[in-house]
UniProtKB/Swiss-Prot annotation:
Location(s), subcellular: Nucleus; Cytoplasm
Principal place of residence: nucleus
Modified residues (Phosphothreonine): T101
Name of the protein in question: Far upstream element-binding protein 2
Region annotation (4 X 12 AA imperfect repeats) ranges: 572-685
Omega-N-methylarginine carried by residues: R40, R412, R414, R416, R443
Keyword Aminoacyl-tRNA synthetase on entry: no
Composition bias, Gly residues: 18-28, 36-69, 409-422
Functional description taken from the UniProt entry: Part of a ternary complex that binds to the downstream control sequence (DCS) of the pre-mRNA. Mediates exon inclusion in transcripts that are subject to tissue-specific alternative splicing. May interact with single-stranded DNA from the far-upstream element (FUSE). May activate gene expression. Also involved in degradation of inherently unstable mRNAs that contain AU-rich elements (AREs) in their 3'-UTR, possibly by recruiting degradation machinery to ARE-containing mRNAs. Binds to the dendritic targeting element and may play a role in mRNA trafficking.
Glycyl lysine isopeptide (Lys-Gly) (interchain with G-Cter in SUMO2) cross-link, renumbered residues: K122
Length: 721
């Protein structure tokens, strides 16, 4: 046995058969220990008998006796077993304790209370404190827990829970906080969420909830907390929908409420409880920015008011009302005309009518697209009338008058509107270099599809070979209205970075070649009525009265196609032009004529006059017939009487003809064709049709020098395609 004392006499000889204390019973100490306690002291058999037990002796036991040593060994074993149990619970390896090393807590300490004369109760209390101090770090005090009520939007609960509870489980695992969502919001816009855990865990769970709600609303993460829990950035407003009118707000298949949400930029929830009576008013919850919520409320009330006035859901000649607007069907090939270049036309309609117009997205298979007009009912109807008038003008437009001399068949002036179209609609054929066809078609045909969608025309590559059989060119066909073809032509020219070359007269080509009138840019190249503003100059161009009816003038439908005339036109160009005149001039033309003919160009100074080319047809009679038919149109009622400029223009062109032939004022016109009568008749009829008041100076024929310059520009103008 080891000696735990630091001083005193050495221990006596061991007893012959028993415990280490000799006659333990004589000491007057406590009763002997349990039977197994003698293992350390080497006591003999028996418990409590003579020499056995190893029980600690009484106070009279001398220091260094066997009793205190046995007591200390039992305590050390208990501490060691407690440490091993704690190590197993904590998952750490058990620590082996060496009782004989000074590192153990009791190896080098004095037995102050043991050696003193303190009572036993104080000794046991001190031993208990020592055990508690060693077992304390094994079981740390539990952390503080808290429970907080948090509120989230009722509509975001499903997003927070996730599919199969995946999202809420992730929140609990990542934050270490228990999340419990209330089963019902009680009709309120927010639902209560109970968060239980340590303060830092609760805070982390709140941040994760904020991120989920912010992403669900389409905003950046972390911006919901202030909105949903007392902030001012979001507004929730409820309005009561009268019984039986909830279907008006929802619409067929939810179409109306979807349109309201898209137009106002808010979220709408119509709270419907299956247990409620159908005759009970139902709340409509609107969530969004304050001004958007207010706008949405007004839109909903407008729908309800229209229903009360008997106007909701009624159809008229312009389309069907949906959500306070009007739907107008527009032929797919005419969408580009309604929109206009760079959206100019649709912007003008919106500004004039005070509405908003949007084309609904569709699959592109139907023959029409729907233009949805939004605004007050009277303004919507006004915009619908404008669109329908525009579409009607596209269905009937004026036939184009003859084009410029030498104008290639099937072509049209680019950008300025000098050329005009003949028969309505139709198609045009152009040749494009083979190596640039891919730019027009695009990968998978995406470029040509985009051109068709933007312009409303139909562009395709022709299987026919070019007229000269050149393999380096391909033919493209564009079908549609003149405006659509022109728009598609410009887009193709931008793709190939060059002009298109028209090929052959096709259906809907231009009018026949004829004398070209003076150049005056303007819509549809109406002739210049009215008196000339400057002395010696030609009459200026006067625009027709502003109005939607004049934007796209009406034209008469053509007569049935004659195959005999078509065959003759294919073989003989003159026969083709003659067929054109006989076909189109037998019917009354539209109210707005095309460009007027121009006088022949005078020869340059010092050069002899050139005789007219041989084989060139004389279109003088055709022009006279053309303007006579135009003159048959009655004058507009209420228009003031117009001054007749016939004589002034006749005199002007006579002088031009004399100068062109090299003669003086009294010289005969010679072989040069005289268009004086045609011009005079044209301007007289134009002045009568448009109702323009004459200028203050009256008709003043232009000077000879300016007239020469005008005629030279007219005949020397090159038509760029």
């Amino acid at each position: 046995m080891s000696d735990y004392s630091t001083g005193g006499p050495p221990p006596g000889p061991p007893p012959p058969a028993g415990g280490g204390g000799g006659a333990a019973g004589a000491g007057g100490g406590p009763p002997p220990g349990p039977p197994g306690a003698g293992d350390r002291g080497g006591g003999g058999p028996g418990g409590g008998g003579p020499g056995g037990g190893g029980a600690s002796g009484g106070p009279s036991q001398p220091p260094g006796g066997g009793g205190p040593g046995i007591r200390k060994d039992a305590f050390a074993d208990a501490v060691q077993r407690a440490r091993q149990i704690a190590a197993k619970i904590g998952g750490d390896a058990a620590t082996t304790v060496n009782n004989n090393t000074p590192d153990f807590g009791f190896g080098g300490q004095k037995r102050q209370l043991e050696d003193g004369d303190q009572p036993d109760s104080k000794k046991l209390a001190s031993q208990g404190d020592s055990i508690g101090s060693q077992l304390g770090p094994i079981h740390p005090p539990p952390r503080t827990s808290m429970t907080e009520e948090y509120r989230v939007p009722d509509g975001m609960v499903g997003l927070i829970i996730g599919r199969g509870g995946e999202q809420i489980n992730k929140i609990q695992q990542d934050s270490g906080c228990k999340v419990q969502i209330s089963p019902d919001s009680g009709g309120l816009p927010e639902r209560s969420v109970s968060l239980t855990g340590a303060p830092e865990s609760v805070q982390k769970a709140k941040m994760m909830l904020d991120d989920i709600v912010s992403r669900g609303r389409g905003g950046p993460p972390g911006q919901f907390h202030d909105n949903a829990n007392g902030g001012q950035n979001g507004t929730v407003q409820e309005i009561m929908i009268p019984a039986g009118k909830a279907g008006l707000v929802i619409g067929k298949g939810g179409e109306t409420i979807k349109q309201l949400q898209e137009r106002a930029g808010v979220k709408m929830i119509l709270i419907q409880d299956g247990s409620q009576n159908t005759n009970v008013d139902k709340p409509l919850r609107i969530i969004g920015d304050p001004y958007k919520v207010q706008q949405a409320c007004e839109m909903v009330m407008d729908i309800l008011r229209e229903r009360d006035q008997g106007g909701f859901g009624d159809r008229n000649e312009y389309g069907s009302r949906v959500g306070g607007g009007i739907d107008v069907p527009v032929p797919r090939h005419s969408v580009g005309v309604v929109i206009g270049r760079s959206g100019e036309m649709i912007k003008k309609i919106q500004n004039d009518a005070g509405v908003r117009i949007q084309f609904k997205q569709d699959d592109g298979t139907g023959p029409e697209k729907i233009a949805h007009i939004m605004g007050p009912p009277d303004r919507c109807e006004h915009a619908a009338r404008i669109i329908n008038d525009l579409l009607q003008s596209l269905r009937s437009g004026p036939p184009g008058p003859p084009g410029a001399p030498g104008m290639p068949p099937g072509g049209r002036g680019r950008g300025r509107g000098q050329g005009n179209w003949g028969p309505p609609g139709g198609e045009m054929t152009f040749s494009i270099p083979t190596h640039k066809c891919g730019l027009v078609i695009g990968r998978g045909g995406e470029n040509v599809k985009a051109i068709n969608q933007q312009t409303g025309a139909f562009v395709e590559i022709s299987r026919q070979l070019p007229p000269n059989g050149d393999p380096n060119f391909k033919l493209f066909v564009i079908r549609g209205s003149p405006q659509q073809i022109d728009h598609a032509k410009q887009l193709i020219e931008e793709k190939i970075e060059g002009p298109l070359c028209p090929v052959g007269p096709g259906p809907g080509g231009p009018g026949p070649a004829g004398p070209m009138g003076p150049f005056h840019p303007g819509p549809f190249n109406q002739g210049p009525p009215g008196a000339p503003p400057h002395a010696g100059g030609p009459p200026p161009h006067q625009y027709p009265p502003q109005g939607w009816g004049n934007t796209y003038p009406e034209w008469q439908p053509p007569a049935p196609h004659d195959p005999n005339k078509a065959a003759a036109a294919a073989t003989d160009p003159n026969a083709a032009w003659a067929a054109y005149y006989s076909h189109y001039y037998q019917q009354p033309p539209g109210p707005v004529p095309g460009p007027a003919p121009a006088p022949a160009a005078p020869p340059a100074q010092g050069e002899p006059p050139q005789p007219p080319p041989t084989g060139q047809s004389d279109y003088t009679k055709a022009w006279e017939e053309y303007y006579k038919k135009i003159g048959q149109q009655p004058q507009q009622p209420g228009a003031p009487p117009q001054q007749d400029y016939t004589k002034a223009w006749e005199e002007y062109y006579k002088k031009q003809a004399q100068v062109a032939t090299g003669g003086g004022p009294g010289a005969p016109p010679g072989s040069q064709p005289d268009y004086s009568a045609a011009w005079a008749e044209y301007y007289r009829q134009q002045a009568a049709y448009y109702g323009q008041t004459p200028g203050p100076g009256g008709p003043q024929p232009p000077s000879t020098q300016q007239g020469q310059q005008q005629a030279t520009e007219a005949n020397g103008y090159e038509l760029h395609l």
